[in-house]
């Protein structure tokens, strides 16, 4: 990526969670992503930054945005990209994650992107392979690149995140996006509010440094950013809400509820959206929505992450240390 060598060396080998990052790490990735946005907006979008490098996308859960975003990011950086279809792989025959990891490791990839239904899967994979690992979502635990792309979207529209009021509304309980965003926003000095019915709030959520409310009017009051989350019914067992209609009435974002936020508040959604459940179409498609911008920033952030993890200066530093130890 153009002039990336002028930026500090990213200090981590993997991206497993926002919890592993310092504010400086986050800002460094966002700065790199800003450069990637410029590349993505050129007529010639492909660079040779990762030419000769191999990227494997290993998705155990269905994904449209994240998988295609990682694939496009890798190709724009010049990497050789392989998408592994779990549905037609040995996983369906009973192969464990560790066995799959060892098989892929023998192919000598440079970076593995994994999405898995179990929390901690990416961290386990990182212990078993010799390449960099990026967590593309592990159960309800973390989704670090989503939080980074959300932060980039906000920063480009609002400037520094410090002191901004961000309301995260919806299914907090099952959301890895909420967890990663809360950690990132707190790290950069934003005030975070979470808005949800009691049944969709994790116990002890207050310990994450957020303001908790069960009222949209209260949660959205003077907010700079309103981030809506979908009901993750595929992760629910039992009745968490009385009905979709009842949920939208109290917690769905419509024009009337949005009036409580600042007039220039950003409306965000990680996708996929359930229109008429957590957000009205008039808001999703309205002038305050930056949902499509989030998709664009997703490619840029994933380009930045992979470039940072595979920075050739890391190998140079390793060789220097080996030389000193000899």
UniProtKB/Swiss-Prot annotation:
Top-rank taxon: Bacteria
UniProt subunit comment: Heterododecamer (2C3:3R2) of six catalytic PyrB chains organized as two trimers (C3), and six regulatory PyrI chains organized as three dimers (R2).
PROSITE patterns noted in UniProt: CARBAMOYLTRANSFERASE
One example GO MF annotation: amino acid binding
Protein name: Aspartate carbamoyltransferase catalytic subunit
Swiss-Prot/TrEMBL keywords: Pyrimidine biosynthesis, Transferase
Pathway: Pyrimidine metabolism; UMP biosynthesis via de novo pathway; (S)-dihydroorotate from bicarbonate: step 2/3
Cystine connections: none
Gene behind this protein: pyrB
Reaction(s) the record says it catalyses: carbamoyl phosphate + L-aspartate = N-carbamoyl-L-aspartate + phosphate + H(+)
HAMAP family xrefs: Asp_carb_tr (MF_00001)
Example of a GO cellular component annotation carried by this entry: cytosol
EC identifiers of the protein: 2.1.3.2
Role played: Catalyzes the condensation of carbamoyl phosphate and aspartate to form carbamoyl aspartate and inorganic phosphate, the committed step in the de novo pyrimidine nucleotide biosynthesis pathway.
Residues that, per the record, bind carbamoyl phosphate: 65-66, 115, 143, 146, 271-272
TM ranges: none
InterPro entries: Asp/Orn_carbamoyltranf_P-bd, Asp/Orn_carbamoylTrfase, Asp/Orn_carbamoylTrfase_sf, Asp_carbamoyltransf, Asp_carbamoyltransf_Asp/Orn-bd
Entry similarity comment: Belongs to the aspartate/ornithine carbamoyltransferase superfamily. ATCase family.
Binding site for L-aspartate: 93, 176, 230
GO aspect biological process, one term: 'de novo' UMP biosynthetic process
Cross-referenced Gene3D superfamilies: Aspartate/ornithine carbamoyltransferase
């Amino acid at each position: 990526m153009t002039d990336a060598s002028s930026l500090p060396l990213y200090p981590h080998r993997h991206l497993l969670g926002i919890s592993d990052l310092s504010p400086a790490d986050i800002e460094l990735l966002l700065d790199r992503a800003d450069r990637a946005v410029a590349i993505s907006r050129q007529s010639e979008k492909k660079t040779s930054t990762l030419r000769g490098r191999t990227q494997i996308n290993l998705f155990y859960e269905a994904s449209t945005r994240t998988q295609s975003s990682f694939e496009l990011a890798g190709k724009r950086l010049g990497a050789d990209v392989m998408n592994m279809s779990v549905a037609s792989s040995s996983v369906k025959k009973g192969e464990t994650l560790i066995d799959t990891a060892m098989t892929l490791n023998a192919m000598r990839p440079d970076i593995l992107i994994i999405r898995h239904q179990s929390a901690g899967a990416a961290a386990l994979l990182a212990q078993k392979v010799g390449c960099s690992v990026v967590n593309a979502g592990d159960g309800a635990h973390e989704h670090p690149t989503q939080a980074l792309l959300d932060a980039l979207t906000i920063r480009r529209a609002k400037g520094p995140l410090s002191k901004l009021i961000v309301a995260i509304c919806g299914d907090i309980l099952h959301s890895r996006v909420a967890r990663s965003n809360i950690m990132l926003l707190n790290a950069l000095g934003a005030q975070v509010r979470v808005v949800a019915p009691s049944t969709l709030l994790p116990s002890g959520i207050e310990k994450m440094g957020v303001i908790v409310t069960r009222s949209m009017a209260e949660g959205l009051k003077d907010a700079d950013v309103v981030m809506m989350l979908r009901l993750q019914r595929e992760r629910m067992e039992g009745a968490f809400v009385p009905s979709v209609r009842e949920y939208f009435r109290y917690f769905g974002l419509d024009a009337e509820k949005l009036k409580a936020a600042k007039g220039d508040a950003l409306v965000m959604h990680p996708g996929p959206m359930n229109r008429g459940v957590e957000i009205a179409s008039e808001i999703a498609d309205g002038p305050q929505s930056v949902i499509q911008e989030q998709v664009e920033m997703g490619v840029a952030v994933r380009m930045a992450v992979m470039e940072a993890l595979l920075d050739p200066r890391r190998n140079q530093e390793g060789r220097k240390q080996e030389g000193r130890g000899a």
